[in-house]
Structure formats: structure tokens, C-alpha cells
Regions:
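Predominantly soluble domains enriched in secretory-pathway, periplasmic, or organellar proteins
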Residues: 25-116
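Sec-dependent signal peptide recognition
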Residues: 6-16
Length: 116
């Protein structure tokens, strides 16, 4: 059994939580959270190749790693949500637009919010 505590030493820890067929049956898009550098990558997979379409900076404090963890998208595909597990002192839930990949709302959560 793999425990997340054993993965804390990895340089980049990727969480892939969502695959969406946005344009057509041959193109799939994934939001991938990178805990150790406070980014989320939007990847495109066409069945053969994976391409990073955009790297989204999700950190709030420039000198602190906030650690993006939980990531999901709403059923209509209009918004995606991300938890930042580390904070000052609590983590946050951020709401993004899938059209612009910009934050449109946020709320403070308790200590170390990881999954949704």
C-alpha cells in the first residue's frame, strides 16, 4: 500500500484528478497540481502526445510554498477548484474559471485541507 507520507520527498508531486473531453473525442485536457512549486498545469492529450498548454501559478505568498493538493472541476465544466494545503495558518479553497484559469473566488479552510 502506498502512503502519501512516503511521497513527501519527491521534488514534484503530481496529483491528477480530472480528465475532461472538452473539444472533441480526440482531445482530452487534464489539470495537474504540482505541490512543490505552487503551479497547476493544463495538459492536452490527443491520444498520442501530451502537451502543456498553460502553467498556472497558484501560490499566494511569494516566499512560501502553499502546496496545491485537492483539485476538481464542476459537472458543467465552467469552474475548477483547488485546495492549498499550507497557509498562514490555514489553507484555502480557490475557485477558477476554466475559460481564463484565473481565480474568481476563495475561502479560508481549516488546517491542511487536502482532498475534495
Amino acid at each position: 500500500m502506498l502512503h502519501f507520507s512516503k511521497l513527501k520527498y519527491l521534488y514534484k508531486f503530481l496529483l491528477i484528478f480530472f480528465v475532461s473531453n472538452i473539444i472533441n473525442a480526440q482531445n482530452y485536457y487534464l489539470y495537474v497540481a504540482s505541490e512543490s512549486d505552487d503551479t497547476v498545469s493544463l495538459l492536452k492529450f490527443d491520444g498520442k502526445h501530451i502537451e502543456e498548454k498553460e502553467r498556472i501559478s497558484v501560490g499566494i505568498y511569494p516566499t512560501e510554498i502553499e502546496g496545491p493538493h485537492g483539485i476538481t472541476i464542476d459537472p458543467n465544466g465552467k469552474y475548477w477548484y483547488l485546495t492549498l494545503a499550507h497557509g498562514n495558518p490555514y489553507g484555502k479553497l480557490l475557485k477558477y474559471s476554466t475559460q481564463t484559469n484565473e481565480v474568481i473566488d476563495e475561502t479560508t479552510l481549516g488546517l491542511f485541507p487536502v482532498s475534495m
